[in-house]
Amino acid sequence: IQYVVYLIKLEKLKKAVVIKKSKAYPKPEVDNPPALQEAAVKYESLRVILGGRQTLRQSLSGDFDLIALTREGIKKSTLKSLAEHLGISMETMSGLLHSSYRNIQRKDEDELLDTLKTEKVLELAAFAQRGIEVIGSKEAFKEWLHSPIVALGNKPPLDFLDTSFGIQLVIKILGRLEQGVFS
C-alpha cells in the first residue's frame, strides 16, 4: 500500500512540475515536427559536403547560421571536400571561384576565405546537396554534372557553375528532372 501511495504522490509531483513549466514556457505538443527534422537533415548534409566537423566546427541549423558563416569566412580546407563532391579538381574549383589556382594553393588549410568566395562555396555546396538529393547518389550526380544536357545546349552543367545565374539555371533543370520532365 505504501508503494502505491508513493507512486500516486510521484505522479502528482510530475504533473505539478509539468504545469509549472508549461505556464512559464509553453511546450509544443510535438518535440520534433517533421519540418524541423527535415531542415536539420538539410543543414547537416550541407555541413558534410563542406567537410564535416573537421572543417566546420559550428553546427548549421538555419539560414542565419549560413549568413554568419559567410561573413566570418570558411577554411580553405572545405574546398577539397566540395571539389570531391562535385568530381572536380582544385584547378577547376579555383576557376569556379574566379581565383587563380596559385592564389588558392598559397593559402594555409586553416586560412579563411573572403566573404565573396565563402558565399560562392556555400552556394555551390547547396547546389551539390540539391543535385545529390534529386539524382539519387553522389556518384550519379557527379556523372550527370559532367555530361552534356540538351537543355543547356549540349553542354555539361559544370560549365554553368561559375555564376549565380548559371547555378540557378542548373537548379531549375534539376527541378524539372525531379518532376519527370525531360531536359
Residue ranges with predicted function:
Residues 2-183:
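Non-transmembrane "mature" sequence context
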